[in-house]
Amino acid sequence: EYYNEGKVRFLAPSKLVFFNPKAKLSRDFSIIVVKILSKILKEPIIICEPLAGCGIRTIRILKEVNNIKKAIIGDINPKAIEIIKHNIALNEVKEHVETYNIDANYLLLSYAISREKFHYIDIDPIGSPVPFLENAFKSLERSGILGFTATDIAPLCGTYPKTCIRRYYAKPLKSPFSKEVALRILIGFAVLTAARFELSFTPIISFFDEYYIRVFGKIDKGVRKVDKNLEKLGWITYCKKCLHREVIEGIWSKINYDCQFCNSEKDYAGPLWIGNTCEKDFCQKMLNEINESYSNNFSKAKKIIELLKGEIDYPSFYYVSHEISSYIKKPPPKLTYIIEEINKKKFSAVPTHFDPKGFKTNAPLEVILKIFRNY
């Protein structure tokens, strides 16, 4: 079974290795991130994909990004390594690649204790990235970037809260904005994991797409930077009766479980990341790169990055139109109408990538409810 993606043709037999054509967006993001990183560092870079499958992500990077000094590809499945070697030869990138048929953590740890570390690591597991983050942080160069995926959406979104607590040391929240809570729990766990090694992990671009969460973040050293990042951890509370949400800053802060608006008991999520999940400058660099080099081939990536850039500096949650219409028992207005009306009232609102009927706003809930009632 041969496929074409980007500038690469490759073999991915479904019975031997896992390959998901729907994850092209995730791989597109990796290409652009690595391309920008190579320009920022202004030196040949070393990359690693320890859970490579058929190797498509790294082979695409080698074909589509200049200035790659070396790529380390690993997989514990010997059949996968055979297919990776076939795909490397097929795409004529052999001189830049080393392949290893070993456990992902063993591969990462072998570089963590060596002088040569990675500028970019990509962790793309089936399930949770938790088992691999610690050694990934240890094997990254200072100013390096870590990209990772989580597909264990059910625990992170609150369907299996005990699993989420075991895995991420955080309580999830089943709510209309569960997807954002899931993303923020994942980032928060990465921040805390890095902090144990006096490393700061700061998200530069992160998103939720269909069945997975994707996070890219940069690392740096220094206790002050770590402590500053830890200040961006906190909690989100939610009243299911009156729909009010609240962001509580500080992992050490006390949570008031009584809703100040209706006196009902509030639910909560956390600890989680309450800072920005993307950097505006990095989003713009990605858009510039797409416009200069990729145009129509990256149309979905471009659309999502534009939405992500718009979401920056808004509260750490979103609203969904059918949630509010159900509460007031009236049909929902169109999203464009909601945003226009909020903007008229000297607040601001933007659509969110999390949900086609969702929006982020700095307007109080009372203002939103009034707009829906007057529609």
Predicted segment positions?
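SAM-dependent transferase fold signal centered on methyltransferase-like domains
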Residues: 1-375
